[in-house]
């Protein structure tokens, strides 16, 4: 500043510095400084200094007054705590005087100074305060006291995007919308000169209209002039951090804004798939996948993701040199993924969001999780004995968005300030503040009006949709009426049919009555005959034979008379029933006619209702037009209001005299607006109520029509059913009467014969029923077997489908090659026409090709015969092996039975020994004899035991020989198959090459002929007849060529089928071999257990020797261990949790069973060789940061070779070529630089190795996972022990196991550590660093732990 300036200009510049909110010496900053000094000096030990005491006595009272006047936490009432982190919490608050709702963030000064991170909040404050962007959460106020920093921000009631993704399955349409909003928000932050560096769904909040805003700017960093950032620590969340940020740890990190676009790609993938693309259970796994992103980025097959979305994700998740967005945000906006018909980039904020939060009030917190109360003790600054300055780092933090302590600078005012009264200036300043508050309120009212207009538009759309639905309902009603008419016609037709059937029934009834009358006449005749017979009996009383015959005749006649009487009574009953049925039919006919008339009346009523509905619909359409006109008028009034507001602001700036007039106009406008709004709302409510009434009336009418229709239909159906039942009863009764009449003519003898016949039939039918029940049981058993076979066939079909897909791909490649060949042939055929000499040469070539094809056929036949012979030999070998296996199984069963018998004998001997011991107390002599007998029995048992052990050893040797034979035969079979396939491929390639050479020769010859001069001259002289002959010959040759092609294609299809069959057989044999190996391993463990029991038996039965506990057999295997452990389900703990399995550890194998039933059936799901075991260790929180904290002490990790694993349903994983990672070799370790944000200690010096924000540089061995400070290696300190693991990382696998308790975990770890072989497995020599892949690179990723470390770090 030049000293020549006047005092007024100097004062004016100072005044501008004091007013500027971005200045470091503004009024708020100076007040913060005085406040901080008073806080830091007001202690008894410091007040002993006179200067400090005088300063405090002078300024303490005024500072206390200023503290009461400035904004403080007591000005707000807390509604609810909606978030909590490491430095404090976020509260939903309401201002006591204005009753406005805000989100207030509290940051503990003690925690920030303790963790030496007292500068991260400045960027957050500046971005939210000065962003002036709709995509960034706005900061209204920032203030402080002696314990906390307070940031009063706008409340986002929609919650974060994590909550949205957990409640909805996000479709691609929604993902496009939210990704576009994130892109615009990041562009706003980049335009301010900052990089966010922690873009994730947790930091994306939704406002009340469902639109997105970015928050949490604590990781932001200012860019230099080149748009780059230099940082030596990696900042961010592990799943969203970019490779260039990870590489910056412990080194010179230099990157730009493209690191934020990487996080956008991860966010888009997570929305569409449901999980992050580089998910792993450990930080090391996540870090290695991010560094190897070219190979580890994959898309699931079951998700329907568009090509544009995949392209955009791949463009984001790539190297920073070619990443989308490196050259500006415009290239992102031009991507095809963002093309749509619903919104544009310029109007994205004005469009309706996919999810608008349903809020009950302005303090609705339904989209936030309920948090428990923080019961921990809050730490504060200790009382210092000397000046510390704890409050000085926070000077200047205070900020007010709409408050100024000083008047606005104006040179004219400064010149005339001496003439203006101070009281007038103060009054004007107050009026300006009031106007600013009123303006702020007017802006809020304007926003509310716009929101109400949007809601009214939405309601109108809903009303239109409801009207359309009502129109559809009316159409449905009309269709139902037409259906009712059709049904009425059908019912009329049915009534006519029923009348006709009733007439037929009447005729039948008349016929039955005639038959009854004839039966009566017959009865009277029979009575007369009986009377005559009685007279004859009186006259011929002398003859006994005639009397007896007459008596017999009387008996029979009396029986027939009784039957006829019974039949007569039954006929009379049936006639009466038929008459009653006829009456009922007549009544039903009358009821049907009445119902028909009723349906006609209902139909006419429905027509009248439909006409009334049509009139109401026209009236509703007119009302909708009126509403639309009113809405347009409302929109015009809103525009007029906006124009008035702008005019008022201009008038306020021009002159202060017009302020009173503008206030009056504004008040009038407010009254008018409120009155119009109320009137419009009342009209809308009236119209909505009218619409609801009309809709209810329509629904009631529709329901009454449907109910009447359903009642009529039910009555008609009931009547029809009753008529049908009555008709069936009548017909049955008529049939019974006819049968009874016919039974009168049948004799008793015939009935007896029929009875006997029926009894025989009954017995025969019972036998048949028994046979059928047996057949049914057999069929059910067969059905169960068929179901099991179907399951196995379905499993095989799935495998065959996978093979079919692979073969289809190969066929497609062959077809493409074939198409290319056909295209070349087509070109050749075009050139053939019109060439006599060329045709002769082509004929020669065709003959040569035919000769080659015949040779090819003969070769194929020979190969097929050889393959069939080899297949037969292999089948024979397999059958022999199976027979040997069955014999071994029988021998094993015999051995088990022998062992059981020996166990029984041992039990008997133990009982005898117990009795002998009791009797030994009574008599010593008897005891000696029994001891001698028992010694003999023990000797016998020992002999049998030795025989059994020899048998078991022989069986084990035979088993090993068989397994060796199996392996050798499988290897030979594989080699033979590979040789056959290679020979076939070679023959095919030779044939293709010969054909290609022939074709190239033909093309070259054609070119030579065409380029000859003689040919050109002869071509001119050629006649038309020659040309025709050539064309005919060409056609013949073309036909022959087509035939040869078809034959060739048929041969290719045949060979392809044979190859498919062979590959399917190979897969089946491999799966069968794996199952056999796993079953053998389980059987071996069972045999081992039996041997251990036998050894225990021999030890316990040897009474004479009584060996001590220390004298054990060194040849016996170590003690087994078995129990329940949990493994990661589907390899993903976060989504699927843990899966329980029963684990058995024998001397050679580790067996995993799904349950105990599988263990009994010797059916393991996975088997590991103990010889291939490398390392066993407990895990730390950094290894499994996805797991719960209480589970970490129960988890341990095992490392083993790929070759030592055998599991069911093995899927061959593609070998990924990973990028080379830099690691340091030291004492066999392969150290990778990393940082720890979770609790971890150095294993060399036992000091802390972690920090939440600035952890020290660390190293971790990717073999044995030893952790240490980097300084130990840099300073060459001899504190690190050599690496305990010696294996190739690329050929090893690891597995996490969860025990039931911490003691169980220790037991498993100690047992498995003893099982690890001292020498590394064969074939696993330590690899050099250059040849190692980075498939399991152990680098740690970093996370800004705010939520997870709350309460843990103090």
Swiss-Prot record:
Q: What does this protein do?
A: Protein kinase which is a key regulator of the actin cytoskeleton and cell polarity. Involved in regulation of smooth muscle contraction, actin cytoskeleton organization, stress fiber and focal adhesion formation, neurite retraction, cell adhesion and motility via phosphorylation of DAPK3, GFAP, LIMK1, LIMK2, MYL9/MLC2, TPPP, PFN1 and PPP1R12A. Phosphorylates FHOD1 and acts synergistically with it to promote SRC-dependent non-apoptotic plasma membrane blebbing. Phosphorylates JIP3 and regulates the recruitment of JNK to JIP3 upon UVB-induced stress.
Alphabetized, the UniProt keywords read:
Acetylation, Apoptosis, ATP-binding, Cell membrane, Cell projection, Coiled coil, Cytoplasm, Cytoskeleton, Golgi apparatus, Kinase, Magnesium, Membrane, Metal-binding, Nucleotide-binding, Phosphoprotein, Serine/threonine-protein kinase, Transferase, Zinc, Zinc-finger
Q: Which residues form the REM-1 domain?
A: 479-556
Q: Where is this region: RHOA binding?
A: 998-1010
Instruction: State the SUPFAM superfamilies in the record.
Output: Cysteine-rich domain, G protein-binding domain, Myosin rod fragments, PH domain-like, Protein kinase-like (PK-like)
Which GO biological-process labels does this protein carry?
A: actomyosin structure organization; apoptotic process; cortical actin cytoskeleton organization; embryonic morphogenesis; mitotic cytokinesis; myoblast migration; podocyte cell migration; positive regulation of focal adhesion assembly
GO CC terms in record: bleb; centriole; cytoplasmic stress granule; cytoskeleton; Golgi membrane; lamellipodium; plasma membrane; ruffle
Can you give the residue ranges of the PH domain?
1118-1317
Region (Interaction with FHOD1), start-end ranges: 368-727
Cofactor(s) needed by this chain: Mg(2+)
Q: Which organism is it from?
A: Oryctolagus cuniculus (Rabbit)
Primary subcellular site in the record, as a coarse category: cytoplasm
* Record entry for activity regulation: Activated by RHOA binding.
**Location of region: SHROOM3 binding:** 707-946
Summarize the PTM comment: Autophosphorylated on serine and threonine residues.
Tissue range of expression?
Detected in corneal epithelium.
- List residues of the AGC-kinase C-terminal domain: 341-409
Positions of the UniProt region annotated as Auto-inhibitory: 1115-1354
InterPro entries according to UniProt: AGC-kinase_C, C1-like_sf, HR1_rho-bd, Kinase-like_dom_sf, PE/DAG-bd, PH-like_dom_sf, PH_domain, Prot_kinase_dom
Q: How does it sit in the membrane?
A: Peripheral membrane protein
Which intervals of the chain form a coiled coil?
422-692, 1011-1102
Instruction: Spell out the subunit comment.
Output: Homodimer. Interacts with RHOA (activated by GTP), RHOB, RHOC, GEM, MYLC2B, RHOE, PPP1R12A, LIMK1, LIMK2, TSG101, CHORDC1, DAPK3, PFN1, PTEN and JIP3. Interacts with FHOD1 in a Src-dependent manner. Interacts with ITGB1BP1 (via N-terminus and PTB domain). Interacts with SHROOM3.
Record's keyword annotation contains Nucleotidyltransferase: no
Top enzyme class, one word, equals transferase
- Record-given protein name: Rho-associated protein kinase 1
Q: Could you tell me one molecular function GO term of this UniProt entry? A: small GTPase binding
Return the domain comment text from this UniProt entry. The C-terminal auto-inhibitory domain interferes with kinase activity. RHOA binding leads to a conformation change and activation of the kinase. Truncated ROCK1 is constitutively activated.
